[in-house]
């Protein structure tokens, strides 16, 4: 920061991330220049909402003069553009905080998401700018310099002027201003002079901001409808206006996947209009804490109280956008009172029940739509299994799984799985892995494939945290096929097995060579065509769970859990090794290398092989030995 103490005009330097942000906005979102107006109107609407809230909750020390409105003035000859609101305004400190810096999480989150889209070759999503709270800066796409004049709603405070070219700095100086609110003015660049024409501004307002709850004027003409759709009966709603309303409140360019209209009268009365987005918002993909901050808008008697109310829905449903309006809370309700209010708790309970019931109806009546919904939000929905025990059974019924008997992209419910279980099967089996292909190639499936037993395939990273917690469904326990505890004692081993003496001998060979690298070595009853496989002990972590924990705790240096190595004593390789051991060749380098290679091949299938170079080198040595004349 630099300033000149001899002048009332002070100059401030932007932080490095601000310069980077402004450069990204101007050069990455240039194909969507009209969004600058959407963002300026959105900010003005927020300022008006804050002003109305302050007026309703306090009678002292506030400038309450004038109507709450937004006015836009343009001149096509000069290219000038002015947008003014009568909202809460800003003090000097707020001006610096709001326009001179951006919360690093918002800035970095926006830049991260934008770069990710560019890297993946996706069409740039102009919706990003609103999701990450950096919308004001989109104005620098259409102008070279912006002037902001503002005065706080607090009586007796000085007005201020902020000016910047969006390069390396901005200036602030005192200004004479009578009315509260904020005025933003600039001259449009030559190539964007279309936005200085009233008809074009009107088009954009009706496209993006028609449902702003405060009047938007171009000169003396009001442009927007200000319709509270949620107050109207569902039978009167038209899909087109519902879609436009969703785009406005959700800051989205796409139509919603579906919407739910709720009207409740009773001990608690409220109306709601809730939406499922057509795809997961970018902020949920690139910001791990985004769900904690999201929620529908809360209105009391048609007055916006909270823009994103986290207390209306449980965290696993906060991908739902919308509006909830009740008359059972006071207008001056505080954040703390909202959290503690029994009214809010009841509304949350009712909305949760209605949403889960709605999802179930979609699943039964519109399976294709539910498939799209589950693809976008299934991972988030699963969070509720470990947090919402009241609705746990409803959530379990919404779960969908690929299996060893479905084609890719086809899903079954647990109810459907149980309905087609093999004769005599008493447990529900699942297998977790990084991909469908990786799981289907795993040796641990051989036993189940041979006996035509269906296995659930869990490739969603969150599955390893939530699915084991279900324990049982329809009185049938869920079991990981990776666990050694699966009872196969009644299963006759496949093929001609080694004698008891030969089995003991080859097991001792593996234990001697592998030593502390394994928890145990045992004869397998699950293998059919593979020589070895790795399984986890009864109380050991599932492999995928352990991997996820390591990824989440990279600095913790978590040791790997030792696995149990199962060997197939009917397999030719194991029988050959048993023969070598029987004639005293246990110390032969080729024999020992073969044992190590089998073990590390199992590690490779698990994705746990630490040194690929050593593995390849040893494989070359074995090939050389096998081809030696």
Curated annotation (Swiss-Prot):
Residues 336-547 are annotated as: B. This is Chaperone protein HtpG. The gene is htpG. It comes from the Bacteria. It is found in: Cytoplasm. Keywords: ATP-binding, Chaperone, Cytoplasm, Nucleotide-binding, Stress response. Pfam families: HATPase_c_3, HSP90. SUPFAM superfamilies: ATPase domain of HSP90 chaperone/DNA topoisomerase II/histidine kinase (SSF55874), HSP90 C-terminal domain (SSF110942), Ribosomal protein S5 domain 2-like (SSF54211).
């Amino acid at each position: 920061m630099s300033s000149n103490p001899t002048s009332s005009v002070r100059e401030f330097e932007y932080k490095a991330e601000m310069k980077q942000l402004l450069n990204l906005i101007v050069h990455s979102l240039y194909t969507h220049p009209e969004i600058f107006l959407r963002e300026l109107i959105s900010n003005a609407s927020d300022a008006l909402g804050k002003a109305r809230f302050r007026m309703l909750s306090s009678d002292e020390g506030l400038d309450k003069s004038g109507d709450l409105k937004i006015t836009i003035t343009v001149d096509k000859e000069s290219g000038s553009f002015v947008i003014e609101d009568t909202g809460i305004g800003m003090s000097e400190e707020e001006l610096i905080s709001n326009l001179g810096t951006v919360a690093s999480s918002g800035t970095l989150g926006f830049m991260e998401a934008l770069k990710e889209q560019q890297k993946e070759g996706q069409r740039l999503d102009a919706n990003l700018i609103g999701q990450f709270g950096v919308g004001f800066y989109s104005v620098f796409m259409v102008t070279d310099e912006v002037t902001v004049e503002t005065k706080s709603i607090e009586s007796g405070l000085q007005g201020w002027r902020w000016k910047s070219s969006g390069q390396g700095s901005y200036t602030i100086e005192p200004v004479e201003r009578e009315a509260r609110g904020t005025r933003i003015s600039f001259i449009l660049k030559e190539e964007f002079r279309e936005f200085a024409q009233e008809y074009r501004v009107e088009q954009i307002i009706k496209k993006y901001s028609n449902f702003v709850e405060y009047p938007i004027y171009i000169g003396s003409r009001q442009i927007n409808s200000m319709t509270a759709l949620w107050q109207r009966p569902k039978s009167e709603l038209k899909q087109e206006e519902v879609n436009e309303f969703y785009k406005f409140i959700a800051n989205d360019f796409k139509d919603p996947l579906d919407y739910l209209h709720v009207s409740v009268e009773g001990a608690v009365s409220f109306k709601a209009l809730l939406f499922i987005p057509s795809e997961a918002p970018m902020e949920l993909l690139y910001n791990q804490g985004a769900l904690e901050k999201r929620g529908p808008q809360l209105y009391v008697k048609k007055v916006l109280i909270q823009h994103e109310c986290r207390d209306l829905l449980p965290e696993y449903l906060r991908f739902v956008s919308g509006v909830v309006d009740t008359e059972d809370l006071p207008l001056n309700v505080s954040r703390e009172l909202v959290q503690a209010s029994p009214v809010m708790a009841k509304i949350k309970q009712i909305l949760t029940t209605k949403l889960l019931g709605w999802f179930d109806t979609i699943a039964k009546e519109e399976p294709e739509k539910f498939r799209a919904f589950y693809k976008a939000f299934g991972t988030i929905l699963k969070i509720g299994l470990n947090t919402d025990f009241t609705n746990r059974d409803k959530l379990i019924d919404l779960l969908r799984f690929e299996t060893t008997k479905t084609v890719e992209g086809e899903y079954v419910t647990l109810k459907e799985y149980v309905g087609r279980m093999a004769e005599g099967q008493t447990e529900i089996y699942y297998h977790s892995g990084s991909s469908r292909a990786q799981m289907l190639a795993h040796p641990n499936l051989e036993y189940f494939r041979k006996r035509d037993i269906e296995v659930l395939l869990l490739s969603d990273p969150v599955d390893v945290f939530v699915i084991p917690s279900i324990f049982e469904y329809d009185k049938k326990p869920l079991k990981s096929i990776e666990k050694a505890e699966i009872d196969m004692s009644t299963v006759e081993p496949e093929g001609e097995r080694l004698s008891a003496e030969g089995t003991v001998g080859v097991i001792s060979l593996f234990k001697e060579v592998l030593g502390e690298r394994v928890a145990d070595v045992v004869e397998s009853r699950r293998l059919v065509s593979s020589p070895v496989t790795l399984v986890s002990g009864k109380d050991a972590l599932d492999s995928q769970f352990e991997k996820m924990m390591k990824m989440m705790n990279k600095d913790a240096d978590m040791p790997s859990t030792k696995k149990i190595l199962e060997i197939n004593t009917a397999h030719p390789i194991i029988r050959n090794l048993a023969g070598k051991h029987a004639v005293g060749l246990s110390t032969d380098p080729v024999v020992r290398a073969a044992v190590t290679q089998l073990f590390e091949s199992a590690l490779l299938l698990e994705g746990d092989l630490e040194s690929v170079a050593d593995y390849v080198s040893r494989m070359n040595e074995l090939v050389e030995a096998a081809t030696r004349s």
